[in-house]
Swiss-Prot record:
The keyword Nucleotide-binding applies. This is Glycerol kinase. It is an enzyme of class 2 (transferase). PANTHER family: GLYCEROL KINASE, SUGAR KINASE. Transmembrane segments: none annotated. The lineage of its organism: Bacteria, Pseudomonadati, Thermodesulfobacteriota, Desulfuromonadia, Geobacterales. Inhibited by fructose 1,6-bisphosphate (FBP). It comes from Citrifermentans bemidjiense (strain ATCC BAA-1014 / DSM 16622 / JCM 12645 / Bem).
Length: 495
């Protein structure tokens, strides 16, 4: 049997899973990851905790599976993207806490660049909007604020990387300073047209070229683990950012195929084929590059509050005792009774990109109940997904035929039925909803030569298909009501 090890580094946990090449999960181990909030809007991780947690997970998962590390054909890595790590090249020691993708400390810098009229240039080269979300402004902040860091970086003593780079450096015993093309595309320093680090963007953000990792295809081979670290020299065979890995794990290999991952937030990603999509609301990014093949691009929609809206019903309002109760409560009424909830609790993402938007509950009457608000919260997740997909359809010129889903909230049958009704296309839930981890394993399988995309596509198995049951006129009527409420929320904090 061929074994594949998937290393999945999330925002709140570290996880390692051992798979058979068939996609069967054999053993898994996880550790929580602490988040640090030194100032309002700041979010940090300890890179050493990331590394030590992953090492413990790898050791535990391999032991649970009862195999020797030497039996593993390939390691795949997937990770929270954009999170920025700097470390000393010689010792491998971190020089600052990692600045997490959620961190907003560089808002003034990105706003200033917008005011200088630079967003169109950045968008054309990277597919991304000028926003603190991405790595470039975070790295610029570190170079400016950490004493002596810029000078050391210019002397070649400092490495920068996203979390995949950090883990590869540590796993290889300091031999591999690499990243994959999907993670590079989230830094705002990588040109998605020329497929190179962009010299003009490096000058704009004042980043020394020598601190950047080498960029490789997603299954191109990334060296080997150190025998001292992992117990054997294992091929690091596949790497992708978490959302790209989930798209791959869902078998979305053809243009127009899309997946939505429902977690605290939600990410909707559509395969857009061999050319970047162009549109106002959706981000254009690189999905992956396989050996001997052209780069595959993707369109992405970011939804900041999805499952977190249900969490707010529980913790903020006390309407439910736990997240699982929301489905039963929402199903106790046939609709939301005209109640809308725009969960702009930390701004709105795709396609609005408004950090100043704030939450709105509208349409309340004397007959409104907590069940109506619970249903409105589920509808809010589905409406936001609809908005993101419409932006992607406009950018790609491709009409969505079905949506594959994963993540924790994909267990909510009512949510998925509402989603199908509002989209007007089937929503498909696979048997395995750990698509991110599985996608990293599949990329490792391709890199190790034990899998190909046709074998992966054949392994995708349906758990349940949700068919739309709502008339188009009713769907559009509900969406107009949603858009009216969104307009109320936009710019609220600024105005």
């Amino acid at each position: 049997m061929e074994y594949l090890l998937s290393i999945d580094q999330g925002t709140t946990s570290s996880r390692a899973t051992l798979y058979a090449a068939s996609g069967e999960s054999l053993a898994t181990a996880s550790r929580p990851l602490a988040q640090h909030y030194p100032n309002p809007g700041w979010v940090e991780h300890d890179p050493q905790e990331i590394w030590e947690g992953q090492l413990a997970c790898i050791t535990e998962a391999v032991a649970k599976a009862g195999i020797a590390p030497s039996q593993i054909a390939g390691v795949g890595i997937t990770n929270q993207r954009e999170t920025t790590v700097v470390w000393e090249r010689e010792t491998g020691l971190p020089l600052h806490r990692a600045i997490v993708w959620q961190d907003r400390r560089t808002a003034e810098l990105t706003e200033s660049l917008k005011e200088q009229g630079l967003e169109a240039m950045v968008r054309e080269r990277t597919g991304l909007l000028l926003d603190p979300y991405f790595s470039a402004s975070k790295l610029c902040w570190l170079l400016d604020r950490v004493d002596g860091l810029r000078q050391r970086a210019e002397r070649g003593e400092v490495c920068f990387g996203t979390v995949d780079s950090w883990l590869m450096f540590k796993l290889s015993g300091g031999k591999s300073h690499l990243t994959d093309i999907s993670n590079a595309s989230r830094t705002m320093l990588f040109n998605i047209n020329t497929l190179e680090w962009d010299e003009e963007l490096l000058r704009l953000f004042r980043i020394p070229r020598g601190m950047l990792p080498e960029v490789r295809g997603s299954a191109a081979g990334f060296g080997h683990t150190s025998g001292e670290v992992a117990g054997a020299e294992i091929h690091i065979a596949g790497v992708a950012g978490d959302q790209q890995a989930a798209l791959f794990g869902q078998g979305c290999f053809a243009p127009g195929m899309a997946k939505a991952t429902f977690g605290t937030g939600a990410f909707v990603v559509m395969n857009s084929g061999a050319r970047p999509g162009v549109g106002d609301g959706a981000l254009s990014t690189i999905a992956w590059q396989l050996p001997g093949e052209a780069v595959q691009y993707a369109l992405e929609g970011s939804i900041f509050i999805a499952g977190a809206a249900v969490q707010w019903l529980q913790e903020g309002l006390g309407l439910i005792g736990n997240a699982r109760e929301v489905e039963v409560l929402a199903a106790s009424v046939p609709d939301s009774g005209g109640v809308y909830f725009v969960p702009a609790l930390s701004g709105l993402g795709t396609p609005y990109w408004d950090p100043y938007a704030r939450g709105v509950v509208a349409g309340l009457t004397r007959g409104s109940t907590k069940a109506h608000l619970a249903r409105a919260a589920l509808e809010a997740i589905a409406f936001q997904t609809l908005d993101a997909i419409r932006a992607m359809e406009q950018a790609s010129g491709i009409a969505l035929k079905e949506l594959r889903v994963d993540g924790g909230a994909a267990a909510n049958n009512l949510l998925l039925q509402i989603q199908a009704d509002l989209l007007g296309v089937p929503v498909l839930r696979p048997r395995c909803t750990e698509s991110t981890s599985l996608g990293a394993a599949f990329l490792a399988g391709i890199g190790a030569g034990v899998l190909d995309t046709s074998a992966i596509a054949a392994q995708w198995a349906l758990d349940r298909r949700f068919e739309p049951q709502m008339e188009r006129e009713r769907r559009e009527e509900l969406h107009r009501g949603w858009q009216k409420c969104v307009r109320l929320s936009l710019g609220w904090e600024k105005n």
